[in-house]
A protein has these predicted regions:
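One-carbon transfer enzymes
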Residues: 1-184
Length: 184
């Protein structure tokens, strides 16, 4: 999807091999890897991570495949300005331990007929923030976790994440308590 009224201030990954870093480099976008593994303590990592983000002065932080717990003080500072994409229709198959292929394995084990993706604001819980957009994807006979993961990415995640960013960038998203409304 197309995203208007935005400029990417930078890309941070906790994985030095993330394609996002390479893609950012190719386009002249500031990028860096900051991983908890590279620091003596979680507190030091949190400080360095927050410093790196603050330097970029973002209006919106987009988490996509960033599998690190965000520091509470950062969530407070960027309240309703930090979003995440999750590969399920929250509140199903979400929370601690539900990421990547595990989400799709559990969905297939449970025998659900519909899965999907959710874009939500980040709060202090895991996948508990106000929901911005969701898109459903049908489970097909014979799906494997890998096939289902790919279909959810292509039919849902890659569509609703850019749309959510565009809506936020253009002032169309309002948060009231735990509910999100979208202006037309």
């Amino acid at each position: 999807g197309e995203i208007t009224n935005t400029k990417i201030a930078g890309v941070i990954s906790n994985n030095k091999n993330a394609y996002a870093l390479e893609r950012a480099e190719k386009h002249g976008i500031p990028n860096q890897c900051i991983s908890p593994k590279d620091y003596e303590s979680r507190e030091i990592f949190n400080q360095e991570f927050m410093k790196a983000v603050d330097v970029m002065q973002p209006d919106l932080i987009v988490l996509a495949g960033f599998l690190v717990v965000i520091p509470a003080e950062m969530i407070a500072k960027y309240r309703n300005r930090m979003i995440n994409i999750h590969p399920s229709l929250i509140p199903a198959f979400c929370g601690t331990g539900f990421y990547g292929l595990k989400v799709h394995e559990k969905a297939l084990e449970r025998g659900v007929k519909v899965v999907g993706a959710t874009v939500h604001f980040v709060d202090e819980g895991t996948d508990t923030g106000p929901i911005i957009l969701q898109k459903a994807v049908e489970v097909e006979q014979g799906d494997t976790p890998e096939v289902l993961q790919r279909r959810v990415m292509e039919q849902a995640e890659w569509r609703i994440l850019p749309r959510a960013i565009d809506l936020i960038a253009n002032g169309k998203v309002k948060v009231e308590g735990h509910r999100v409304t979208i202006e037309s």
